[in-house]
């Protein structure tokens, strides 16, 4: 049994070796095929490049050849034209010529004379143009002098800087309102109207009267509650009587004072009115 196992193992190892050898051979073949394919591709690419280069060269050669042929034909045609005698050639083979109509030479001469005359006239024109320009200049000078005279005749309007600045007048009016003498200042702005002169005088007198009015000394102060005593009925009665007597006297004095002033104000108003 041992011998059989050893024999089987040897046979299996031999088979493995054979398989390995076959695989190595296949790999070598594959490598060779790949190299062959790569070489074929490189050869094809080189062929394509060569063909393209040859095609370009052929195209350039054809262009050069065509140019040479065209130049050669042109040169031959020019030589033929130079060598061809005009008298010996028949009318059919003569080259085409553009004939001018009859009488064209006369028209050209007339046109040349007309151009010469026009050139001479144009040479004489500058003097006339200078005279016209001088007339225009003189007319422009006349217009400018007339415009300047009209401007000088018109009265000049006062500039904005000549107008009076009312800053001082505003300050004076403010101070007059603070003091109460609104219409008493001599530096008033403008002359008042005749209709409002008396009214202004009356209003100013009233304002001065209200400001300068002093409390009358005849009035006795009102009794305080602390001055009165409970039960002092006679003292209260005397105080009431005194107050009732003093009030009508003060009112009468006020009426007389205001009446006199109003009368004087009215007289002033009538005197000032025209």
UniProtKB/Swiss-Prot annotation:
Residues 182-194 have a biased composition (Polar residues). It is found in: Cytoplasm, Cytoskeleton; Cytoplasm, Myofibril; Cytoplasm, Cytoskeleton, Stress fiber. One of its GO terms (molecular function) is actin filament binding. Keywords: Actin-binding, Calmodulin-binding, Cytoplasm, Cytoskeleton, Muscle protein. One of its GO terms (biological process) is muscle contraction. Coiled coil: none annotated. Residues 12-21, 28-95, 226-245, 260-274 have a biased composition (Basic and acidic residues). Residues 1-102, 179-274 are annotated as: Disordered. It holds the Pfam family Caldesmon. GO terms for cellular component: actin filament; myofibril; stress fiber. PANTHER family: CALDESMON. Control of actomyosin interactions in smooth muscle and nonmuscle cells (could act as a bridge between myosin and actin filaments). Inhibits the actin-activated ATPase of myosin this inhibition is attenuated by calcium-calmodulin and is potentiated by tropomyosin. Interacts with actin, myosin, 2 molecules of tropomyosin and with calmodulin. This is Caldesmon, smooth muscle. The lineage of its organism: Eukaryota, Metazoa, Chordata, Craniata, Vertebrata. The gene is CALD1.
